[in-house]
Amino acid sequence: MAEQFSMLRSELTELLLVAVGAVPGALLRWQLAHHLGDQNLLVNVLGAALLGLLAGRPVAPRRQLLVGIGFCGSLTTFSSWMLAAMKHVSAGDWPAALGLIGLTLGLGLGAAALGFSLGRRLRPPEQPRSEP
């Protein structure tokens, strides 16, 4: 019974971390859309850079849940990106659809790589191991 309670407590803590991280990510996305208009490209590239940064350095699992899954997951948008591409396809504008997909993939991959590289540079130096 105690083990089940401990497992449930751990899962609820993880769920709470994701939810707490998701709120500011969603609010930032909403504010960017409110002030700058449709900014799927901006939020997806920004989210990719931040995830790359997290991946490039040692991050505690709880921070990964809070920032990686919660914040970045709610900031970025795959479905809105695909809907924008589909609207171009529906209008018969395949070049615009493919351009949007290619641009987002290219910039997103570049941003993730840049974030990863920066994360590696910001990584704390490895501590020398003392041998017994």
From Swiss-Prot:
How is the activity of this protein regulated?
A: Na(+) is not transported, but it plays an essential structural role and its presence is essential for fluoride channel function.
Chain positions recorded as Na(+) binding sites = 73, 76
Q: Known InterPro entries for this protein?
A: FluC (IPR003691)
Q: Where in the cell is it found?
A: Cell inner membrane
Membrane topology classification: Multi-pass membrane protein
Q: Pfam families of this UniProt entry?
A: CRCB
Per the record's keyword annotation, is Nucleus included, yes or no?
A: no
Q: What is its main location?
A: membrane
* BP terms from Gene Ontology: cellular detoxification of fluoride
Report the catalytic activity: fluoride(in) = fluoride(out)
GO MF annotations in UniProt: fluoride channel activity; metal ion binding
What keywords are assigned to this protein? Cell inner membrane, Cell membrane, Ion channel, Ion transport, Membrane, Metal-binding, Sodium, Transmembrane, Transmembrane helix, Transport
- Any one GO cellular component localisation term in the record: plasma membrane
| Keyword Calcium carried by entry | no
Which domain of life does the protein's organism represent? Bacteria
Membrane spanning residue stretches: 12-32, 41-61, 65-85, 96-116
- Homology family: Belongs to the fluoride channel Fluc/FEX (TC 1.A.43) family.
What is the role of the protein in this entry? Fluoride-specific ion channel. Important for reducing fluoride concentration in the cell, thus reducing its toxicity.
Descriptive protein name: Fluoride-specific ion channel FluC 2
Q: Give the source species.
A: Parasynechococcus marenigrum (strain WH8102)
Q: Which gene holds the coding sequence for this protein?
A: fluC2
